[in-house]
Amino acid sequence: MLRFLLILAVFWLNIAHQSYAETISPKIVGGTTANSAPPWMAALWITTDLDVGFCSGTLIDSQWVMTAAHCVDVTDSQGHAPTITAVIGQADLTMLPPPAVVDSMIIYSNYDSSTMYGDIALLHLTTPQYTTTVTLPYSNASAYLPSGIQMRVYGWGETEAGVTQSEASATNFLQTATLTYWGFDTDFPDHIFAGDYGKDTCFGDSGSPLLYDGIQYGITSFGFNLTCATGVPGGYTDVSYYSSWIDNTLGWAESSDNSSSGGGGDIELVMLGLALLLLRLRFRFQI
């Protein structure tokens, strides 16, 4: 069933990707306003002459932010890369400090926007950020996470369930929620799944972290269906799948492996047996 759903999702995702200005990402539904932002939480503005996009990310090193590849895999009308700025550790986006500027980015070389494989990117900041960085898992650590645990998400995305892409808006105040972890599926080898009925990441939350016990296991990547919080788990890029790639890219390891292999374990997503599910990027663009 999931292979059939993936074919449908790929068809619709290809249509959506043709016009990135119309693409929206998720924000958190069913959460609460965070009292403060984790010091490593990043708000990202992706600017071209066509649009201004918004995503989230996490500070993984003093000058590196990790986010979803689909957030930054865009160009302007001349084919140039976007201008990206970041604000680190700020919960209230109505009171912004001077942003950090991204001077280069590295998108996973085998990123595929039609399947969302490799939906991970690293952004280099011009100036170091002297604050706490997020804790990353060891290689394939997600394979040992038991299904049913409660994981935490953060984001500035849509907060109302049942909202469609055209109706979505963002919030200026960081939201947080706990989501049930469901596990893996072989159709999405580099993703893990989490979500609940009435609680979900949604439009505007792309790139935001999924954490357990203070460790970031996921990057908000995509959702099924046209609206959020329907009870169908969302897809999160498995950070531990890319541990070796991150280490090598940042010079943390001497090996030159392209990426770590994915963990095992199938997930039975019974709720995915809906008549038609649309692969929904959790990314928002605004004029």
Describe every region a protein language model picked out.
Residues 21-48:
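N-terminal activation segment of mature serine protease catalytic domains
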Residues 47-50, 70-77, 89-94, 126-131, ...:
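Acidic glycine-/aspartate-rich tracts in secreted/extracellular proteins
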Residues 44-45, 65-68, 72-110, 178:
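Conserved H-D interstitial segment of serine endopeptidase catalytic domains
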Residues 92, 105, 117-198, 239-240:
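Chymotrypsin/trypsin-fold serine protease catalytic domain
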Residues 267-286:
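A cross-kingdom C-terminal cell-surface attachment/processing module
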Residues 34, 40-42, 54-73, 82-85, ...:
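C-terminal subregion of chymotrypsin/trypsin-like serine protease catalytic domains
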Residues 5-14, 275-277:
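Bacterial N-terminal signal peptides
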Residues 15-21:
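Sec/Tat signal peptide C-region and signal peptidase I cleavage site
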